[in-house]
């Protein structure tokens, strides 16, 4: 990972900052420079295009990246100056660690709540809210209102000050999450940090560390300290590792310890499968693919082994009491989501959703931010029902879905089958889309799989933004279309989501530099390019129009005034 800045950069782009009401609220954007348009009257400048930027300081020329030191604590001053947190002498969980990062965890002072929802309900517009308002090109008061109502969340653990605030809610840009993390048989800490950087380079708005192998704590520490975007986890995975991988041995005490450990590290949101209740499990018996959620299957196995109610459900109030001390958002897991088209929208899925609605109200009582996880595998004609039910049953809390995949017949191409569903469900109002890579159902994704998954989901999210009419969503489309029609090939590449791939495909057949201004590509050639023909048609229409105007001028007696 040498020369990280080069690894993260985009062609003809520079980092710019938009300053807020105070000097330390500086919102990053990526500005793409465009070449001028050639006209008969001369060259006409095209304004640069600014786009949402998730790369953090890595693309700032004034920042020297070092994964052993991590990122600067952007939000620490905002957090401390509110006066409601205290620095701990040491972690409250006994763990062995030999890591290069020197930091003391923060938590709320006794009797205090430090969540963005808590501040929003009290009419306070925090620097985090102002930051996301500038990012979204929307009024800060709207941000505050949406967070206060629970319709949006700002995942921002007080122990992850390195993160740049972002918002998840249906009134804002549709966001995407990229899953990374090792497995019991593959990957290393260096691999996962590289995947993190690669994911945010291509536009991931959050990442989830789903590590299930060795060195879970160490891997997560490196990811959090180097992540400019919120980091999510599924705590049950690490809790299971602590009991030797045997679900029956799980206890509330082990899980509670894991929650605190991860909250003190800086995890911004946690998937908690509290909706998998004992009496719902038999509803999955006749499914085609049973329970496909890892967390859901672990909890189901524990419930059946002990014939007891899910301890995450019975201890949910305590979970909220813990997480509100750090501002960890809850992502209510869909442990009974359908894993096949045959199981879509079944009784088990919607039974769990009803419980998630009940738990949402409990979390909001504690001012804990919540989003709701959703499926899964859903055919296109059943997608809308999922959004409508979630919005009604879960009181408008943000919806966060895995795809959904709209068909089961394309292993190796599930980034496509799921991006189709993601675009549709995003247009209906889903707030965040969890990416799927080409390796889904087949193996642990590598760096190139992460790229393919993120880009596929950026396409889906942007398509949904266009459908929703988000402010400024179409600006980039219009700029690229104009560049395409004017045969400004380099601008067309640079405005695309994946400039390298666009340039690579073009240059396979027309690599010469002169081809970057040619009025054709290798698909149609110079004689059959519809856009080149359109240029000729427009020129002729203008000429004919001028001739008609001249004749009209003569008919009117060659007089300017009548």
UniProtKB/Swiss-Prot annotation:
Residue sites binding Zn(2+) per the record: 377, 441
Q: Name one Pfam family in it.
A: ThiC_Rad_SAM
Which residues are noted in the entry as [4Fe-4S] cluster-binding? Answer: 521, 524, 529
- Gene Ontology annotations of biological process type: thiamine biosynthetic process; thiamine diphosphate biosynthetic process
List the GO terms this entry assigns under cellular component, sorted alphabetically.
Answer: cytosol
Q: Where does substrate bind?
A: 179, 208, 237, 273, 293-295, 334-337, 373, 400
Q: What is its EC number?
A: 4.1.99.17
Query: Any idea which GO molecular function terms this record carries?
Result: 4 iron, 4 sulfur cluster binding; carbon-carbon lyase activity; zinc ion binding
Q: What enzyme class is recorded for this protein? A: lyase
Named in its record, the pathway it takes part in is: Cofactor biosynthesis; thiamine diphosphate biosynthesis
Cofactors that this protein relies on: [4Fe-4S] cluster
Does Zinc appear among the keywords?
Answer: yes
Which reaction equation describes what this protein catalyses? 5-amino-1-(5-phospho-beta-D-ribosyl)imidazole + S-adenosyl-L-methionine = 4-amino-2-methyl-5-(phosphooxymethyl)pyrimidine + CO + 5'-deoxyadenosine + formate + L-methionine + 3 H(+)
Q: Which UniProt keywords apply?
A: 4Fe-4S, Iron, Iron-sulfur, Lyase, Metal-binding, S-adenosyl-L-methionine, Thiamine biosynthesis, Zinc
Record has ATP-binding as a keyword:
no
Function as written in the Swiss-Prot or TrEMBL entry: Catalyzes the synthesis of the hydroxymethylpyrimidine phosphate (HMP-P) moiety of thiamine from aminoimidazole ribotide (AIR) in a radical S-adenosyl-L-methionine (SAM)-dependent reaction.
Similarity annotation: Belongs to the ThiC family.
The protein's name:
Phosphomethylpyrimidine synthase
- List the gene name: thiC
């Amino acid at each position: 990972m040498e020369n990280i800045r080069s690894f993260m950069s985009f062609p003809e782009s520079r980092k710019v900052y938009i300053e807020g009401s105070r000097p330390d609220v500086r919102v990053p954007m990526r500005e793409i420079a465009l070449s001028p348009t050639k006209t008969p009257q001369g060259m006409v400048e095209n304004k640069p295009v600014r786009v949402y930027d998730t790369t953090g300081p890595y693309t700032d020329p004034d920042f020297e990246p070092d994964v052993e030191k991590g990122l600067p604590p952007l939000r620490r001053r905002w957090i401390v100056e509110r006066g409601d947190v205290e620095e701990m002498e040491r972690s409250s969980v006994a763990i062995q660690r030999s890591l290069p990062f020197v930091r003391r965890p923060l938590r709320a002072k006794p009797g205090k709540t430090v969540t963005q929802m808590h501040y929003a309900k009290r009419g306070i517009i925090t620097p985090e809210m102002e930051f996301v308002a500038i990012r979204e090109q929307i009024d800060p008061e709207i941000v505050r209102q949406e967070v206060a109502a629970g319709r949006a969340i700002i995942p921002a653990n007080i122990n992850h000050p390195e993160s740049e605030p972002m918002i998840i809610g249906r009134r804002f840009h549709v966001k995407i999450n990229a899953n990374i993390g090792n497995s019991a048989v593959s990957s290393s800490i260096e691999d996962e940090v590289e995947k993190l950087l690669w994911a945010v380079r291509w536009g991931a708005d959050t990442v989830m560390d789903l590590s299930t192998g060795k060195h879970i704590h160490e891997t997560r520490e490196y990811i959090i300290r180097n992540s400019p975007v919120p980091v999510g986890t599924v705590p049950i995975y690490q809790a299971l590792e602590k009991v030797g991988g045997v679900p029956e041995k799980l206890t509330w005490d082990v899980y509670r310890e894991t929650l605190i450990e991860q909250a003190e590290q800086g995890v911004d949101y946690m998937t908690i499968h509290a909706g998998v209740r004992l009496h719902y499990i038999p509803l999955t018996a006749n499914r085609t693919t049973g329970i496909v959620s890892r967390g859901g299957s672990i909890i189901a196995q524990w419930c059946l082994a002990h014939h007891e109610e899910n301890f995450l459900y019975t201890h949910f109030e305590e979970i909220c009491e813990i997480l509100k001390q750090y501002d960890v958002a809850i992502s209510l897991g869909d442990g009974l989501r359908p894993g096949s088209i045959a199981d879509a929208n079944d009784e088990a899925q919607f039974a769990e959703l009803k419980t998630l609605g009940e738990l949402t109200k409990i979390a909001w009582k504690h001012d804990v931010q919540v989003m709701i996880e959703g499926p899964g595998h859903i055919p296109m004609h059943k997608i809308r029902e999922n959004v409508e039910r979630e919005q009604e049953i879960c009181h408008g809390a943000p919806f966060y879905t895995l795809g959904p995949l709209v068909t089961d017949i394309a292993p190796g191409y599930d980034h496509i089958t799921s991006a189709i569903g993601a675009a549709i469900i995003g247009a209906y109002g889903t707030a965040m889309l969890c990416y799927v890579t080409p390796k889904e159902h087949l193996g642990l994704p590598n760096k190139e799989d992460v790229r393919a998954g993120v880009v596929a989901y950026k396409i889906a999210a942007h398509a949904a933004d266009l459908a929703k009419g988000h402010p400024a969503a179409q600006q980039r489309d219009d700029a690229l279309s104009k560049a395409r029609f004017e045969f400004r090939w380099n601008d067309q590449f640079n405005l695309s989501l994946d400039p390298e791939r666009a340039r690579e495909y073009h240059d396979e057949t027309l690599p010469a530099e002169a081809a970057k201004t040619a009025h054709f590509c290798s698909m149609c050639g110079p004689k059959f390019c519809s856009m080149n023909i359109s240029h000729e048609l427009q020129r002729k229409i203008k000429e004919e129009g001028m001739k008609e105007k001249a004749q009209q001028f003569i008919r009117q007696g060659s007089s300017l005034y009548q």
